[in-house]
């Protein structure tokens, strides 16, 4: 299955910059120790793979998901083999005392990449998960940055989101607050960030849900009025790597808009996905109809779909990567704006 074809593209976004800076990136990776926080999530795994395949001096990965961490190790061993450097994984929370002990005993690290986040707009619908979102997206970032600074890290990278530009929901606002705190901390610690679009088929995403629905022979449901930019998992790792290794202090990287990157609706992706799998989408009038006719339609190589107008409170009508009052550098890279 071609992710690029499903999201309506035929070219990868960052190839030219990755190739142009390949030697510099590889040399920095080979002589450095890395800590990746949230490394077993979708973006975290992509970043870990980009670092691992360039044979770092040391690569330590932290994530609270023990199962995802096990799969990450299996994936790396199956695709990249074994590097010559020190590779370790730790199933711990970056906000815990165990993490502080890890930093004290396993550090120092030249580069700290923090990919941990609560990223779903729906997570702000109750006060308890919202409190957790603020803890993860703001306070844990500050804590881990100060620990990195204390041990003399060369760079602290943190992933942000396009929703931090003129935020309209608490998820985006929490990331914007994070950016503001990091700018303050940049007085004593070099930092860089990246804002980018939806990562196609990332854990918990609607596209990841398509995989789940397909494997369980269940109907597809998707909004037909929400248009989004999508990057592949590999592209998410490449953008983070470019920012973390080549970004100057306080830089925020984002994908340049071009003919390669364009908006596409979730319903369009659902149609492309099903046709890629050999099924013709059959649009139903309701979710009930889609559920009731699932077995009948699937047997005829048709897949029941229900497309609707979005009802998720706080969803942004459009996506943007920067605001009018931010200084832009569109010349330094071919495919990335800063």
Regions found by a protein language model. Give the residues of each.
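Hydrophobic/small residue at the entry helix of a nucleotide-binding pocket
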Residues: 43
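NAD(P)H-binding glycine-rich loop region in Rossmannoid oxidoreductase-like domains
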Residues: 46, 50-61, 77, 94-133
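Rossmann-fold cofactor-recognition segment
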Residues: 80-96
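Conserved Rossmann-fold NAD(P)-dependent oxidoreductase catalytic core, especially the SDR/UDP-sugar
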Residues: 114, 118-179, 184
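Strand-loop microenvironment adjacent to phosphate/nucleotide-handling motifs in alpha/beta enzyme folds
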Residues: 6-7, 24, 182-338
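Helix N-cap at the beta1-alpha1 junction of Rossmann-like dinucleotide-binding domains, i.e.
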Residues: 63-68
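Conserved glycine-rich cofactor-binding loop
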Residues: 40
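Non-catalytic terminal and boundary segments that flank Rossmann-like NAD(P)-dependent oxidoreductase
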Residues: 1-34
